[in-house]
Amino acid sequence: MRFIKRPLISIVNDHLIDYPTPINIHYAWNFGFLSSICLIVQILTGIFLAMHYTPHVDLAFASVEHIMRDVNYGWLLRYIHTNGASMFFIVVYIHIFRGLYFGSYIKPRHWVWVIGVLILLLMILTAFIGYVLPWGQMSLWGATVITNLVSAVPFIGDSIVTWLWGGFSVDNATLNRFFSLHYLMPFVIAAVSLVHLAILHQDGSGNPLGIDSNVDKVSMFPYFIVKDFLGMVIFIIFFSIFVYFSPNVLGHPDNYIEANPMVTPAHIVPEWYFLPFYAILRSIPHKLGGVTAMISAIAILAFLPWIHSTEIRSSRFRPLYRLFYWVMISCCLILGWIGGMPVENPYVIIGQIASIYYFIYFIILLPVLGRIEKFLLEFKI
């Protein structure tokens, strides 16, 4: 066992082998492991794609087609990378919703939650700048629309936009800096993920019952490693269906048209995993108000440890909260649908109602429901 006591090996052993894990965690706890698999896949495929990609407005689109047609298994690398981004967001969104359901944001794991929200923000930034790189119509116009939102910042907004673009429009300088940042950001996400894991293991994992128990725990290996690998096999099958049978179903057909600044697409939409936030942005007619609401929709998650008022972690014992939780999930799905629809009625009104409920849930319902539950428990109602 002297081998295990070596510094690097002991870290791996403490966090992945002998790590004490609650015996009652189920497959909802698989998604942290799956998100790390997605990140590794994205980094590896991204490195190989970068070897053949050219970050120049005249060559970017052609270099992507070169990867698809001429590079050995280039089509596979690209489809794994593009669909891998979607899989990454699916896994992370489920991971977040699981945390909301089982109260993973409640102390002592509140800093784990805050770091997780930071990872989500970094993922959104990375995915956005990555969407620009193929230099199709949706890449160019999506970049133009989203970066233009910064101009809503009073006094300095226009200067920041010019600085982001590296000129007076989305052009070669923009593409170069986006490529550079897109290559760097996954490694930043990996570093922050290690911090996320280290802080989690300081206080230990939660469990479906939401109780702290240092007695009913077993080592992570082999019990939960085997469970994680079973989840990974199911995930790979699901992932492979998209890669091999429907590789473009989650993309936009306009991005197979080379970027043309003289022709505006009929309907500019971001990737599907941004649609709920995009719907919140469009729900407010005022530009600065919409941008503030969109940013707040993400930032508010980081403040949940200080907003909630309940003493019960798990929703298994909170029937009243559970009802409002599932309404919130429905609103998120509705916002995702509305984000892909034209800006016209009734879509605008539906988006506004769903956006209002989203914020009411976090700002009003979370603290109020906790106090109502406390009152009902005290009087045994």
Curated annotation (Swiss-Prot):
Domain of life from the UniProt record: Eukaryota
A single Gene Ontology CC term: respiratory chain complex III
Keywords: Electron transport, Heme, Iron, Membrane, Metal-binding, Mitochondrion, Mitochondrion inner membrane, Respiratory chain, Transmembrane, Transmembrane helix, Transport, Ubiquinone
Location within or outside the cell: Mitochondrion inner membrane
Residues that bind heme b b566: H95, H196
Cofactor, how bound (note): Binds 2 heme b groups non-covalently.
One Pfam family cited in the UniProt record for this chain: Cytochrom_B_C
InterPro entries referenced in this protein's UniProt entry, alphabetically: Cyt_b/b6_C, Cyt_b/b6_C_sf, Cyt_b/b6_N, Cytb/b6-like_sf, Cytochrome_b, Cytochrome_b_C_euk/bac, Cytochrome_b_N_euk/bac, Di-haem_cyt_TM
Residues noted as binding heme b b562 in the record, renumbered to the chain: H81, H182
Cofactor(s), names only, from the UniProt record: heme b
SUPFAM superfamilies referenced in this protein's UniProt entry, alphabetically: a domain/subunit of cytochrome bc1 complex (Ubiquinol-cytochrome c reductase), Transmembrane di-heme cytochromes
PANTHER family given in the database record: CYTOCHROME B
Function: Component of the ubiquinol-cytochrome c reductase complex (complex III or cytochrome b-c1 complex) that is part of the mitochondrial respiratory chain. The b-c1 complex mediates electron transfer from ubiquinol to cytochrome c. Contributes to the generation of a proton gradient across the mitochondrial membrane that is then used for ATP synthesis.
Other noteworthy facts: Heme 1 (or BL or b562) is low-potential and absorbs at about 562 nm, and heme 2 (or BH or b566) is high-potential and absorbs at about 566 nm.
Record-stated family: Belongs to the cytochrome b family.
Protein name per Swiss-Prot or TrEMBL: Cytochrome b
